[in-house]
Amino acid sequence: ITDGIATRHNFLFGGCGLGAAVAAMEGECDRPVVWATAQYLSFAMTGEVMDLDVIVAVSGMMTTQARVVAHVGNREILTVNAALGEKPLPYDEQWVTMPEVPSPGDCPLRSDLVADGKSIMSRFDMRLAMGTPWDAFDGTPAPGARSALWVHTPEVEMSAAAIAILGDYVPFGISQAFGDWIPSNSLDNTIRVHRLEPTEADRKVPYLQDRVQLSHLPGA
């Protein structure tokens, strides 16, 4: 676990764990991930070595069901279940509508909550398309609990693994929804991938109670 895939608190960023598992399953099964869900169980700290064991439960003509157990020694860090494959169909529809936001060049850079030059947070070019800068939080909730970022990943092409990383920006969305910084940890993340296209990260938060949060990232 290196600084570049860790949080500022020196543990593996949850989205990077799910992304690594997605990449491992796609490599082992030679099929694209269409759905994956991760259960986060423990922390992997910088400097530790995390192994990923891929188990292919069922492999059919068009669909594979597999899972990954990620562990540091005997300590399990996360478990990921996934479906992989594709089935040609004569239909191509999308019912999720992208929000109307300014183009990336017209949006300000997303400011950092804390100065940072080495964690996962430093590896993206993020533009705040809809939301409030950290230093302007005043307790005013975001309309409809919605915020949006333009995100450029200069080091990697867009992929299911990259979407898994971006999908873990729940603390950003929760804080935007309430207009205040609310630290939180991931219990589980789920991604569904229809077709990989250049897209924005649009975060909507429909539920928060007693520190259990539901958030989703449409458009993947």
Where are these regions (language model features)?
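Terminal targeting signals and extreme-terminal segments of soluble enzymes
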Residues: I1-A220
